[in-house]
């Protein structure tokens, strides 16, 4: 039977980082961070047992002047805590003002964005403002595999050279920070201030609910809305994608009801109070796998003065070759309901099957 051991270390005089030694083959340990004896956050990391593959930093700046306790539970089978103390990680677990993030990887992409360290996938909440592109993304800062979902953050003036920033939104008591989208609230509809950046994302804990965070400094730091969740459904749903609909004068949000094989459409005057207007997808298109990461957009019809609405639905798995894919539906949208032009049994795939996959 697996038994957890608990090791505590109290830090008062903080340096910039706590460096965590990682071994890829080790089981996950749980690190609970307590601030002034109250739970602040929790994450999993594969703390080194036999050898150290690399170090990852835990940023401490936000805790300066506070008493921080790290409550670490290892995942190994032990007979007593002394066995856990022999693990390789304890020799190199240390405080530091520096972290070596030099890129020594020969095969790291040059033009494609990658984080300085850690694991990433879905791009989230992208926006352009004041001459800069902002990219948020699903990010695990504590290992090279999926887990500990945060919103990482980078910015660029040319979409080639990227400046990396601290994590924008991190998990809290409502759960991990899954995919979502963001908008520039030019008219202060939410009441947080003109040109505030509003992010809506899925909080994934015991259930999947939708949360809001806002930024008053062009997306560099976010404040989590105190009245979250803003949408709580009785079924699994995720990946909110929102936009302003001029004709109805409301914000529209599309939410993937993953296991129902549907997209739910909501409207709001203020980004905080949402009304479910309709659903689309039951019996339509590819019904295999999980529906997720939707998008709904109005596009011009080539050679005419008309427009059509396109609803993009990512699935995983269920693609033509068995893996992930993106399907799309063409139709009309009146601010409440999406009406598809084609019959339910017709499935339209994006040209490369995956190039639109899991974007927000």
Where are these regions (language model features)?
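Beta-rich carbohydrate-recognition and catalytic domains
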Residues: 8-240, 244-293, 298-351
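Conserved small/polar residues in nucleotide/adenosyl-binding loops
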Residues: 2-9, 354-360
């Amino acid at each position: 039977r697996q038994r957890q051991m608990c090791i505590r270390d109290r830090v008062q005089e903080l340096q910039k980082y706590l460096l965590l030694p990682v071994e890829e083959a080790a089981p996950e340990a749980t690190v609970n961070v307590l601030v002034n004896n109250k739970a602040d956050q929790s994450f999993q990391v594969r703390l080194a047992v036999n050898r150290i593959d690399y170090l990852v930093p835990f940023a401490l700046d936000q805790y300066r002047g506070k008493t921080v306790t790290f409550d670490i539970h290892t995942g190994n089978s032990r007979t007593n805590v002394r066995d856990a103390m022999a693990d390789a990680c304890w020799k190199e677990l240390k405080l530091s003002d520096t972290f070596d993030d030099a890129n020594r990887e020969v095969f790291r992409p040059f033009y494609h964005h990658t984080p300085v360290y850690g694991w990433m996938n879905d791009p989230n909440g992208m926006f352009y403002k004041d001459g800069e592109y902002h990219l948020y993304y699903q990010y695990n800062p504590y290992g090279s595999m999926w887990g500990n979902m945060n919103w990482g953050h980078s910015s660029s003036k040319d979409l080639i050279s990227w400046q990396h920033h601290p994590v924008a939104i991190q998990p809290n008591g409502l759960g991990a920070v899954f995919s979502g989208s963001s908008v520039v609230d030019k008219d202060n509809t939410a009441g947080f201030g003109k040109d505030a950046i509003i992010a809506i994302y899925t909080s994934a804990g015991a259930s999947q609910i939708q949360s809001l965070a806002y930024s008053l400094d062009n997306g560099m730091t976010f404040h989590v809305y105190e009245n979250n969740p803003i949408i709580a459904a009785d079924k699994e749903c995720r990946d909110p994608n929102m936009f302003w609909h001029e004709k109805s004068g409301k914000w529209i949000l599309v939410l993937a009801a993953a296991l129902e094989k549907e997209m739910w459409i909501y409207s709001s005057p203020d980004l905080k109070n949402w009304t479910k207007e309709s659903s689309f997808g039951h019996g339509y298109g590819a019904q295999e796998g999980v529906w997720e990461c939707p998008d709904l957009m109005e596009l011009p019809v080539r050679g005419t003065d008309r427009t059509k609405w396109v609803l993009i639905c990512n699935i995983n798995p269920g693609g033509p070759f068995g893996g992930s894919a993106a399907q799309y539906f063409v139709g009309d949208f009146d601010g409440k309901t999406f009406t598809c032009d084609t019959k339910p049994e017709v499935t339209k795939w994006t040209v490369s099957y995956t190039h639109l996959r899991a974007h927000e």
